[in-house]
Amino acid sequence: PVWAVEGDIKGCFDNINHRLLLKKLWRIGIHDKRVLKIISQMLKAGYIDQDLYHATEMGTPQGGILSPLLSNVYLNDFDWYVGRCYLEPHRQCKHKCNDTRRLKWSGITPKYNFRYADDWVILTSTEQEAFRMKHELTKYFKHRMKLELSQEKTYVTDLRKNGIHFLGYIVKAERKRKTPDPATWSDNLVGKPFPDMERLTKKIHTLQKEVRKIGLYTQSNTQAAQIQYVNSVIMGLAQYLQPSICSHAYHAIDRRVNNTALAVWKNLFPKQYNQMQVPLKELSNLPHRHEGYDSKTFAIQIDGKWFGITYAFITHSRYESKPFDQKMTPYTEDGRRRYVNYRTKHKPLPCDRPSINTPEDIALSIYASGKGWKANFEYFMNREYAYNRDKGKCKCCGRYFSELIPKHCHHVNPRLPIERINKVPNLAWLCIPCHRMVHNSPIPPELDAKAVRKIKKYREKLKK
């Protein structure tokens, strides 16, 4: 589908009909009249503005905990209406995929509905069907839902020419990017999400105001707290844009924040603002995020420690490799299993797995604790945590451990003092062949390139 109907409901939350809402609540199964009465009284409670009481005959209160749920109940009929227009009244086959194929052969155009709160998009295959749906839904909202579609903001869009605006993204239909392997090239269109730069620019302006507030404070502790708040906003924006093609958006955030920080630091430290630029890896705030990055950022020094502004580009793009499974839910066993399969690449470790440590290992650890040996009690306890962290697989080749693939626990840096050598970050689980290769055993030429890089990385850490 390359044609889209972008819908905009005029004042959706302010124009919800209370009578219809209560009827819909009854229809979905809320039959306790006391609960319905409480909801009705909440909806009609009104509000006071400048000492004047205003009655609320329509709409749901904005910002309330219950309002998003009530609006979803109200618009649930719209979702089912679009579904019934395509598939539900025509069910003949046992499996839905066969029905879809049958409807396609009979000339019925498929439709896909996406809705988040009051923002919705319907995808279809032809321009004629898109305009027909727009006209039909205008009448449906007016007569059945007692709401009005904004004709100025409800568009019919060709995704091949213009993208649809949805939840801060612009989604376009374009050809897949070509890879080095010609066998994977295809002329099929795919949906590509891009950040909505117009909306992002407004967010960046708000972020720049927060950066300027750093210059209003005189105490370094207050400045550091404001820097932490700015960092949380930057990371929040970056993580929201993660599923899209967002490198240009990240650079826009970093460029404008850095320019604003330059002006603030010039005002705070007129003679030494250049010395206040330090590499990210030297910052004491967010050390795991900044590890290994040499890009310089503006920072302040407190008790010999640097606290600086982070960069958005550190948050890498992450595309969803699997389509969303609508049967995921925390309320059923099947829904929870689907969630685990959707969110994790591999099956989680079983909760009842046997301990790695044998009774002989524990006895050896107790004997070794007072003698300064590496294999002390802390080692045998922490390697259990390291095994869980590594998800029961080799850190180099990625194979899962079993009776056929035995394992060793490797010390990343064996020259650390005894109080640091057995900490969890210094332990890594490797299969025996990879462990031997780390300790200078020959690397076979057929080994995966990614595994070779990891083995060489562990070798370098042994030499330091």
Where are these regions (language model features)?
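Conserved polymerase palm-domain catalytic core
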Residues: P1-Q151, V156-L159, G163
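Glycine- and acidic
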Residues: E6-G7, T56-I65, A117-L123, K213-Q219, ...
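A conserved non-catalytic segment of reverse transcriptases
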Residues: S40, K44, Q50-Y53, M145-Y229, ...
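Flexible, glycine/threonine-enriched loop-and-boundary segments that flank and lead into catalytic domains
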Residues: C93-I108, L149, A375-R383, K391, ...
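Non-catalytic, peripheral interaction segments enriched in hydrophobic/basic residues
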Residues: G215, T222-H290
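Acidic catalytic cores of enzymes that act on phosphate-bearing nucleotides/polynucleotides
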Residues: A263-A368, G372-W373
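Short, charged surface segments at domain edges that flank catalytic/cofactor-binding sites
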Residues: P350-C396, E419-I421, P425, Y458
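Histidine-centered nuclease catalytic patch
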Residues: G398-I432, P442-E446
